[in-house]
A protein has these predicted regions:
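C-terminal motif of bacterial Sec signal peptides marking the signal peptidase cleavage site
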Residues: 18-21
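Predominantly soluble domains enriched in secretory-pathway, periplasmic, or organellar proteins
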Residues: 12, 23-375
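Short, ordered beta-strand-loop transition motifs
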Residues: 5, 272, 286, 427-428, ...
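A domain-level signal for the mature, folded cores of soluble proteins
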Residues: 376-450
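Bacterial N-terminal signal peptides that target proteins for export
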Residues: 1-9
Protein backbone atom coordinates (compact mmCIF):
# COMPACT_ATOMS: atom_id res chain seq x y z
CA UNK A 1 0.00 0.00 0.00
CA UNK A 2 1.38 3.38 -0.96
CA UNK A 3 1.54 6.27 1.43
CA UNK A 4 0.63 9.71 0.19
CA UNK A 5 1.57 13.13 1.47
CA UNK A 6 -1.24 15.67 1.46
CA UNK A 7 -0.18 19.27 1.75
CA UNK A 8 -2.62 22.02 2.69
CA UNK A 9 -1.49 25.45 1.62
CA UNK A 10 -3.18 28.74 2.49
CA UNK A 11 -2.72 32.33 1.46
CA UNK A 12 -1.51 33.11 5.01
CA UNK A 13 1.59 31.04 4.13
CA UNK A 14 0.72 28.58 6.88
CA UNK A 15 0.34 24.92 6.03
CA UNK A 16 -0.42 21.56 7.54
CA UNK A 17 1.01 18.23 6.45
CA UNK A 18 -1.20 15.21 6.84
CA UNK A 19 -0.28 11.59 6.20
CA UNK A 20 -2.99 9.26 4.95
CA UNK A 21 -3.05 5.82 3.43
CA UNK A 22 -5.07 5.23 0.29
CA UNK A 23 -5.31 2.85 -2.65
CA UNK A 24 -7.27 4.89 -5.17
CA UNK A 25 -4.77 7.65 -5.99
CA UNK A 26 -2.62 6.41 -8.87
CA UNK A 27 0.49 8.28 -9.95
CA UNK A 28 -0.12 10.16 -13.21
CA UNK A 29 3.26 11.42 -14.40
CA UNK A 30 3.28 14.27 -16.89
CA UNK A 31 4.00 12.97 -20.40
CA UNK A 32 4.32 14.55 -23.81
CA UNK A 33 2.14 12.30 -25.93
CA UNK A 34 2.50 11.68 -29.64
CA UNK A 35 -0.63 11.47 -31.79
CA UNK A 36 -0.36 10.25 -35.38
CA UNK A 37 2.69 9.08 -37.30
CA UNK A 38 5.65 11.45 -36.89
CA UNK A 39 7.68 10.61 -39.98
CA UNK A 40 9.37 13.29 -42.06
CA UNK A 41 11.34 13.59 -45.29
CA UNK A 42 15.03 14.32 -44.77
CA UNK A 43 14.55 15.47 -41.18
CA UNK A 44 16.44 13.98 -38.24
CA UNK A 45 15.34 16.29 -35.42
CA UNK A 46 13.24 19.30 -34.62
CA UNK A 47 13.56 21.78 -31.78
CA UNK A 48 10.72 23.75 -30.19
CA UNK A 49 11.38 26.95 -28.26
CA UNK A 50 8.87 27.60 -25.49
CA UNK A 51 8.58 31.16 -24.24
CA UNK A 52 7.32 30.31 -20.77
CA UNK A 53 5.58 32.97 -18.70
CA UNK A 54 6.71 36.58 -18.36
CA UNK A 55 8.91 37.11 -15.28
CA UNK A 56 8.66 33.41 -14.33
CA UNK A 57 12.14 32.47 -15.64
CA UNK A 58 10.78 29.26 -17.18
CA UNK A 59 11.61 29.33 -20.89
CA UNK A 60 12.49 25.90 -22.28
CA UNK A 61 13.85 24.16 -25.36
CA UNK A 62 12.35 20.83 -26.43
CA UNK A 63 13.93 18.31 -28.81
CA UNK A 64 12.12 15.66 -30.85
CA UNK A 65 14.12 12.94 -32.61
CA UNK A 66 12.42 11.32 -35.59
CA UNK A 67 14.74 8.30 -35.43
CA UNK A 68 13.64 7.03 -32.01
CA UNK A 69 10.39 9.04 -31.75
CA UNK A 70 11.57 10.56 -28.47
CA UNK A 71 10.61 13.92 -26.97
CA UNK A 72 12.82 15.68 -24.44
CA UNK A 73 10.66 18.55 -23.18
CA UNK A 74 13.31 20.54 -21.31
CA UNK A 75 16.31 19.49 -23.38
CA UNK A 76 18.52 22.48 -22.56
CA UNK A 77 17.99 22.14 -18.81
CA UNK A 78 18.50 18.37 -18.90
CA UNK A 79 21.91 18.82 -20.53
CA UNK A 80 23.11 21.99 -18.79
CA UNK A 81 21.38 21.71 -15.37
CA UNK A 82 20.06 25.26 -15.62
CA UNK A 83 17.23 26.99 -17.42
CA UNK A 84 17.37 29.19 -20.50
CA UNK A 85 16.06 32.22 -18.63
CA UNK A 86 13.04 34.51 -18.89
CA UNK A 87 10.85 34.88 -22.00
CA UNK A 88 12.68 33.28 -24.92
CA UNK A 89 11.43 34.83 -28.18
CA UNK A 90 13.39 33.40 -31.09
CA UNK A 91 15.63 30.51 -32.10
CA UNK A 92 17.57 29.38 -35.15
CA UNK A 93 20.08 26.70 -36.14
CA UNK A 94 23.05 28.14 -38.02
CA UNK A 95 26.08 26.01 -38.83
CA UNK A 96 26.93 23.80 -35.87
CA UNK A 97 25.14 25.93 -33.29
CA UNK A 98 21.67 26.69 -31.97
CA UNK A 99 21.00 30.33 -31.12
CA UNK A 100 18.26 31.25 -28.63
CA UNK A 101 17.13 34.84 -27.98
CA UNK A 102 15.99 35.34 -24.36
CA UNK A 103 14.26 38.69 -24.10
CA UNK A 104 13.77 39.52 -20.41
CA UNK A 105 17.05 37.85 -19.39
CA UNK A 106 18.66 39.93 -22.18
CA UNK A 107 20.88 37.12 -23.44
CA UNK A 108 21.70 35.19 -26.57
CA UNK A 109 22.23 31.56 -25.59
CA UNK A 110 24.59 29.78 -28.00
CA UNK A 111 24.32 25.98 -27.86
CA UNK A 112 26.51 23.31 -29.42
CA UNK A 113 24.16 21.38 -31.70
CA UNK A 114 26.06 18.11 -31.37
CA UNK A 115 25.99 17.91 -27.56
CA UNK A 116 23.29 20.37 -26.47
CA UNK A 117 25.82 22.06 -24.17
CA UNK A 118 25.91 25.82 -23.77
CA UNK A 119 28.91 27.34 -25.53
CA UNK A 120 28.32 30.90 -24.41
CA UNK A 121 25.63 33.10 -22.91
CA UNK A 122 26.10 36.44 -24.63
CA UNK A 123 24.96 39.31 -22.42
CA UNK A 124 23.02 41.90 -24.40
CA UNK A 125 23.70 44.99 -22.29
CA UNK A 126 24.10 48.67 -23.07
CA UNK A 127 27.18 50.62 -21.99
CA UNK A 128 25.40 51.73 -18.81
CA UNK A 129 24.60 48.11 -17.93
CA UNK A 130 20.90 48.27 -18.82
CA UNK A 131 19.24 45.40 -20.67
CA UNK A 132 18.88 45.76 -24.41
CA UNK A 133 16.06 43.16 -24.43
CA UNK A 134 16.88 41.21 -27.62
CA UNK A 135 13.95 40.01 -29.72
CA UNK A 136 14.89 38.28 -33.00
CA UNK A 137 17.89 37.00 -34.93
CA UNK A 138 18.96 36.69 -38.58
CA UNK A 139 22.17 35.44 -40.25
CA UNK A 140 24.34 36.38 -43.20
CA UNK A 141 27.85 35.19 -44.14
CA UNK A 142 29.01 33.94 -40.73
CA UNK A 143 27.48 36.86 -38.87
CA UNK A 144 24.43 36.91 -36.63
CA UNK A 145 22.27 40.02 -36.39
CA UNK A 146 20.12 40.55 -33.30
CA UNK A 147 17.51 43.30 -33.02
CA UNK A 148 16.69 44.55 -29.52
CA UNK A 149 13.93 46.57 -27.92
CA UNK A 150 16.35 49.39 -27.07
CA UNK A 151 16.36 50.40 -30.74
CA UNK A 152 19.56 48.67 -31.82
CA UNK A 153 20.87 45.82 -33.95
CA UNK A 154 23.97 43.93 -32.82
CA UNK A 155 26.37 42.14 -35.17
CA UNK A 156 27.82 38.96 -33.65
CA UNK A 157 30.67 36.94 -35.14
CA UNK A 158 29.55 33.29 -35.23
CA UNK A 159 33.10 31.98 -34.72
CA UNK A 160 34.31 34.10 -31.78
CA UNK A 161 30.74 34.61 -30.46
CA UNK A 162 31.62 38.21 -29.64
CA UNK A 163 29.62 41.35 -30.38
CA UNK A 164 31.48 43.23 -33.11
CA UNK A 165 29.30 46.28 -33.59
CA UNK A 166 26.01 47.96 -32.68
CA UNK A 167 23.89 50.16 -34.94
CA UNK A 168 20.77 52.20 -34.18
CA UNK A 169 17.43 51.74 -35.94
CA UNK A 170 13.84 52.61 -34.93
CA UNK A 171 11.82 52.18 -31.75
CA UNK A 172 11.43 48.74 -30.18
CA UNK A 173 12.46 46.53 -33.13
CA UNK A 174 10.29 43.41 -33.29
CA UNK A 175 11.56 41.47 -36.29
CA UNK A 176 14.56 41.16 -38.62
CA UNK A 177 15.36 39.48 -41.95
CA UNK A 178 17.97 39.59 -44.73
CA UNK A 179 17.32 40.39 -48.39
CA UNK A 180 19.65 41.67 -51.14
CA UNK A 181 22.64 42.31 -48.83
CA UNK A 182 20.46 44.40 -46.56
CA UNK A 183 18.82 43.97 -43.17
CA UNK A 184 15.14 44.79 -42.83
CA UNK A 185 14.04 45.55 -39.27
CA UNK A 186 10.43 46.14 -38.20
CA UNK A 187 10.21 49.01 -35.70
CA UNK A 188 7.15 48.34 -33.56
CA UNK A 189 7.27 51.14 -31.00
CA UNK A 190 5.17 48.75 -28.95
CA UNK A 191 6.56 49.89 -25.61
CA UNK A 192 5.26 53.40 -26.37
CA UNK A 193 1.70 52.17 -26.96
CA UNK A 194 0.25 53.79 -23.84
CA UNK A 195 2.36 56.94 -24.03
CA UNK A 196 1.64 60.05 -26.03
CA UNK A 197 4.26 59.00 -28.55
CA UNK A 198 2.29 55.96 -29.76
CA UNK A 199 3.56 53.03 -31.79
CA UNK A 200 6.13 53.19 -34.59
CA UNK A 201 5.17 52.50 -38.21
CA UNK A 202 8.46 51.96 -40.01
CA UNK A 203 10.88 49.34 -41.31
CA UNK A 204 14.56 50.26 -41.12
CA UNK A 205 16.82 49.25 -44.01
CA UNK A 206 20.43 48.65 -42.96
CA UNK A 207 23.19 48.14 -45.51
CA UNK A 208 25.14 45.07 -44.38
CA UNK A 209 28.46 46.28 -45.82
CA UNK A 210 28.45 49.58 -43.92
CA UNK A 211 26.20 48.39 -41.07
CA UNK A 212 24.39 51.71 -41.17
CA UNK A 213 20.72 52.53 -41.63
CA UNK A 214 20.20 53.70 -45.21
CA UNK A 215 16.46 54.39 -45.13
CA UNK A 216 13.19 54.03 -43.23
CA UNK A 217 10.05 52.81 -44.97
CA UNK A 218 6.56 53.60 -43.67
CA UNK A 219 4.56 50.34 -43.62
CA UNK A 220 1.78 50.82 -41.06
CA UNK A 221 1.34 50.96 -37.29
CA UNK A 222 3.15 48.49 -35.04
CA UNK A 223 5.00 46.26 -37.54
CA UNK A 224 6.07 42.87 -36.20
CA UNK A 225 6.88 39.62 -38.03
CA UNK A 226 9.06 40.28 -41.08
CA UNK A 227 10.22 37.66 -43.60
CA UNK A 228 12.17 37.69 -46.87
CA UNK A 229 9.98 36.64 -49.81
CA UNK A 230 10.51 35.61 -53.43
CA UNK A 231 11.60 37.95 -56.24
CA UNK A 232 13.51 40.38 -54.00
CA UNK A 233 10.62 41.13 -51.68
CA UNK A 234 10.07 41.38 -47.94
CA UNK A 235 6.74 40.86 -46.17
CA UNK A 236 5.74 42.29 -42.80
CA UNK A 237 2.67 42.00 -40.58
CA UNK A 238 1.46 45.27 -39.05
CA UNK A 239 -0.66 44.97 -35.92
CA UNK A 240 -2.30 48.36 -35.51
CA UNK A 241 -2.34 50.73 -32.55
CA UNK A 242 -4.00 48.11 -30.32
CA UNK A 243 -3.04 44.47 -30.93
CA UNK A 244 -6.27 43.15 -29.43
CA UNK A 245 -8.39 45.32 -31.75
CA UNK A 246 -7.37 43.11 -34.69
CA UNK A 247 -6.40 45.91 -37.08
CA UNK A 248 -3.80 43.75 -38.83
CA UNK A 249 -2.38 44.08 -42.35
CA UNK A 250 -0.08 42.11 -44.61
CA UNK A 251 2.44 44.45 -46.25
CA UNK A 252 4.78 43.86 -49.19
CA UNK A 253 8.08 45.69 -49.73
CA UNK A 254 9.68 45.62 -53.19
CA UNK A 255 13.37 45.72 -52.26
CA UNK A 256 14.42 46.94 -55.72
CA UNK A 257 12.30 50.10 -55.54
CA UNK A 258 11.38 50.35 -51.81
CA UNK A 259 7.74 50.47 -52.89
CA UNK A 260 5.36 49.51 -50.07
CA UNK A 261 2.03 47.82 -50.87
CA UNK A 262 -0.62 47.10 -48.26
CA UNK A 263 -3.24 44.39 -48.58
CA UNK A 264 -6.51 43.75 -46.79
CA UNK A 265 -5.30 40.43 -45.41
CA UNK A 266 -5.71 40.20 -41.63
CA UNK A 267 -2.43 38.64 -40.53
CA UNK A 268 -0.93 38.31 -37.08
CA UNK A 269 1.82 35.85 -37.97
CA UNK A 270 2.92 34.02 -41.10
CA UNK A 271 5.47 31.77 -42.79
CA UNK A 272 6.63 31.71 -46.41
CA UNK A 273 7.42 28.66 -48.54
CA UNK A 274 8.50 29.77 -52.01
CA UNK A 275 5.59 31.68 -53.52
CA UNK A 276 3.11 30.44 -50.91
CA UNK A 277 2.43 32.18 -47.60
CA UNK A 278 0.59 30.62 -44.68
CA UNK A 279 -1.18 33.38 -42.78
CA UNK A 280 -2.84 33.12 -39.42
CA UNK A 281 -4.99 35.53 -37.48
CA UNK A 282 -6.35 35.43 -33.93
CA UNK A 283 -9.50 37.30 -32.90
CA UNK A 284 -9.18 38.36 -29.26
CA UNK A 285 -12.88 39.20 -29.00
CA UNK A 286 -14.23 35.85 -30.19
CA UNK A 287 -11.10 33.90 -29.15
CA UNK A 288 -11.05 32.14 -32.50
CA UNK A 289 -8.33 31.72 -35.10
CA UNK A 290 -8.11 31.38 -38.87
CA UNK A 291 -5.29 30.07 -41.09
CA UNK A 292 -5.21 30.54 -44.86
CA UNK A 293 -2.97 29.80 -47.87
CA UNK A 294 -2.03 32.82 -49.97
CA UNK A 295 -0.21 33.04 -53.32
CA UNK A 296 2.35 35.85 -53.11
CA UNK A 297 2.83 36.07 -56.88
CA UNK A 298 -0.83 36.36 -57.87
CA UNK A 299 -1.84 37.94 -54.54
CA UNK A 300 -4.82 35.60 -54.38
CA UNK A 301 -6.09 33.31 -51.65
CA UNK A 302 -5.47 29.66 -52.49
CA UNK A 303 -7.53 28.26 -49.66
CA UNK A 304 -9.45 30.32 -47.14
CA UNK A 305 -9.16 27.53 -44.59
CA UNK A 306 -5.75 25.89 -44.80
CA UNK A 307 -6.73 23.06 -42.44
CA UNK A 308 -9.04 20.67 -44.29
CA UNK A 309 -9.56 17.76 -41.88
CA UNK A 310 -11.45 19.57 -39.12
CA UNK A 311 -8.50 19.95 -36.76
CA UNK A 312 -9.07 22.93 -34.47
CA UNK A 313 -6.28 25.19 -33.24
CA UNK A 314 -7.66 27.49 -30.55
CA UNK A 315 -4.66 29.75 -29.99
CA UNK A 316 -1.96 29.58 -32.70
CA UNK A 317 1.30 30.92 -31.31
CA UNK A 318 3.96 30.09 -33.88
CA UNK A 319 4.28 28.88 -37.47
CA UNK A 320 7.29 27.50 -39.35
CA UNK A 321 7.88 25.53 -42.56
CA UNK A 322 10.08 22.42 -42.54
CA UNK A 323 12.58 23.21 -45.34
CA UNK A 324 13.24 19.50 -45.94
CA UNK A 325 9.62 18.41 -46.45
CA UNK A 326 7.66 21.67 -46.90
CA UNK A 327 5.25 20.54 -44.20
CA UNK A 328 3.65 23.26 -42.08
CA UNK A 329 4.18 23.30 -38.31
CA UNK A 330 1.87 25.32 -36.08
CA UNK A 331 2.03 25.63 -32.30
CA UNK A 332 -1.01 25.72 -30.01
CA UNK A 333 -0.68 27.84 -26.84
CA UNK A 334 -4.10 26.88 -25.39
CA UNK A 335 -4.77 29.46 -22.63
CA UNK A 336 -1.13 30.66 -22.33
CA UNK A 337 -0.80 29.13 -18.83
CA UNK A 338 -0.86 25.39 -19.63
CA UNK A 339 1.52 23.36 -21.75
CA UNK A 340 0.89 23.79 -25.48
CA UNK A 341 1.20 21.44 -28.46
CA UNK A 342 3.00 21.22 -31.79
CA UNK A 343 0.99 20.18 -34.87
CA UNK A 344 2.37 19.12 -38.25
CA UNK A 345 0.25 19.46 -41.41
CA UNK A 346 0.97 18.49 -45.00
CA UNK A 347 0.37 21.01 -47.77
CA UNK A 348 -3.14 19.64 -48.23
CA UNK A 349 -3.99 20.85 -44.74
CA UNK A 350 -4.22 17.38 -43.19
CA UNK A 351 -2.83 16.72 -39.72
CA UNK A 352 0.11 14.31 -39.91
CA UNK A 353 1.00 14.21 -36.23
CA UNK A 354 0.76 16.14 -32.98
CA UNK A 355 3.23 16.42 -30.10
CA UNK A 356 1.17 17.15 -27.00
CA UNK A 357 2.31 19.16 -23.98
CA UNK A 358 5.58 20.27 -25.56
CA UNK A 359 5.99 23.30 -23.26
CA UNK A 360 4.59 26.65 -22.11
CA UNK A 361 3.78 28.98 -25.02
CA UNK A 362 5.73 27.27 -27.83
CA UNK A 363 6.65 29.94 -30.37
CA UNK A 364 9.42 28.77 -32.72
CA UNK A 365 10.37 25.51 -34.45
CA UNK A 366 13.76 24.74 -36.01
CA UNK A 367 14.63 21.67 -38.11
CA UNK A 368 17.80 19.68 -38.74
CA UNK A 369 18.71 17.02 -41.29
CA UNK A 370 21.41 15.80 -38.92
CA UNK A 371 20.98 14.14 -35.53
CA UNK A 372 22.65 15.45 -32.39
CA UNK A 373 24.78 13.08 -30.31
CA UNK A 374 23.22 13.76 -26.91
CA UNK A 375 21.42 10.61 -25.75
CA UNK A 376 19.65 12.30 -22.85
CA UNK A 377 16.00 11.28 -22.44
CA UNK A 378 12.82 12.98 -21.24
CA UNK A 379 13.22 11.77 -17.66
CA UNK A 380 16.67 13.25 -17.15
CA UNK A 381 15.46 16.81 -16.54
CA UNK A 382 13.61 15.79 -13.36
CA UNK A 383 15.99 13.17 -11.95
CA UNK A 384 16.87 15.31 -8.97
CA UNK A 385 13.33 15.24 -7.54
CA UNK A 386 11.08 12.58 -9.15
CA UNK A 387 8.56 12.72 -6.26
CA UNK A 388 8.56 16.48 -5.83
CA UNK A 389 5.43 17.27 -7.82
CA UNK A 390 1.81 17.02 -6.72
CA UNK A 391 -0.40 14.72 -8.78
CA UNK A 392 -3.82 15.12 -7.14
CA UNK A 393 -6.07 17.95 -5.95
CA UNK A 394 -8.22 16.83 -3.02
CA UNK A 395 -9.81 20.19 -2.26
CA UNK A 396 -9.84 23.55 -4.03
CA UNK A 397 -11.40 26.55 -2.25
CA UNK A 398 -10.41 29.90 -3.79
CA UNK A 399 -11.24 33.08 -1.91
CA UNK A 400 -14.83 34.07 -2.81
CA UNK A 401 -15.44 36.99 -5.13
CA UNK A 402 -11.78 37.75 -5.70
CA UNK A 403 -11.09 36.24 -9.14
CA UNK A 404 -9.08 38.54 -11.33
CA UNK A 405 -7.22 36.25 -13.72
CA UNK A 406 -9.87 33.68 -14.59
CA UNK A 407 -7.58 31.96 -17.11
CA UNK A 408 -5.70 30.44 -14.17
CA UNK A 409 -8.80 29.28 -12.32
CA UNK A 410 -10.18 25.73 -12.40
CA UNK A 411 -13.72 27.14 -12.36
CA UNK A 412 -15.56 27.10 -15.69
CA UNK A 413 -19.20 27.80 -16.46
CA UNK A 414 -21.36 24.74 -15.89
CA UNK A 415 -18.72 22.81 -13.93
CA UNK A 416 -19.72 20.66 -10.96
CA UNK A 417 -17.36 20.54 -8.00
CA UNK A 418 -16.02 17.19 -9.25
CA UNK A 419 -15.33 18.82 -12.62
CA UNK A 420 -13.48 21.62 -10.85
CA UNK A 421 -11.29 19.17 -8.94
CA UNK A 422 -10.55 17.30 -12.16
CA UNK A 423 -9.54 20.52 -13.94
CA UNK A 424 -7.41 21.62 -10.97
CA UNK A 425 -5.70 18.22 -10.97
CA UNK A 426 -4.97 18.52 -14.69
CA UNK A 427 -3.35 21.92 -14.17
CA UNK A 428 -1.25 20.68 -11.26
CA UNK A 429 -0.07 17.65 -13.24
CA UNK A 430 0.96 19.96 -16.09
CA UNK A 431 2.82 22.25 -13.66
CA UNK A 432 0.60 25.18 -14.69
CA UNK A 433 -0.54 28.22 -12.73
CA UNK A 434 -3.62 27.79 -10.54
CA UNK A 435 -5.03 30.82 -8.75
CA UNK A 436 -6.32 30.82 -5.17
CA UNK A 437 -8.33 33.95 -5.94
CA UNK A 438 -6.95 36.10 -3.16
CA UNK A 439 -6.37 36.26 0.59
CA UNK A 440 -8.04 33.32 2.30
CA UNK A 441 -8.07 30.81 -0.55
CA UNK A 442 -6.54 27.37 -0.08
CA UNK A 443 -5.84 24.12 -1.88
CA UNK A 444 -5.22 20.56 -0.66
CA UNK A 445 -2.66 18.70 -2.78
CA UNK A 446 -1.63 15.05 -2.85
CA UNK A 447 1.99 14.05 -3.43
CA UNK A 448 3.24 10.54 -4.27
CA UNK A 449 5.50 9.06 -1.60
CA UNK A 450 6.88 5.54 -1.31
Amino acid sequence: MKRKLIYIFSCWLSFLILFVACDDMEDKPFTSGIIGDPTETGTAELYVLCEGLFNQNNSSLARFSFGNQQIVRDYFKAVNRRGLGDTANDMAIYGSKIYVIVNISSTVEVIDFRTGSSLKQIQMLAENGSSRQPRYIAFHKEKAYVCSYDGTVARIDTTSLSIEAITSVGRNPDGICVQNEKLYISNSGGLDYSSGLGVDNTVSVVDIATFKESSKLTVGPNPGKIVAGPDETVYVATRGEDVEAGDYNFVKIDCRTNKVTQSNEKVQNFAIDGEIAYLYNYNYNTQTSSIKMFNLKTEETIRENFITDGTVIKTPYGININPYSNNVYITEARDYTTYGDLLCFNQQGQLMFRLNNIGLNPNTIAFSDKASQSDIDDNDDDKENPLAFANKVWEYRPAPGQFINTTTSAYKEGFTYDDILEEATRRIQQKSLLTLGGFGGYIVLGFPQS
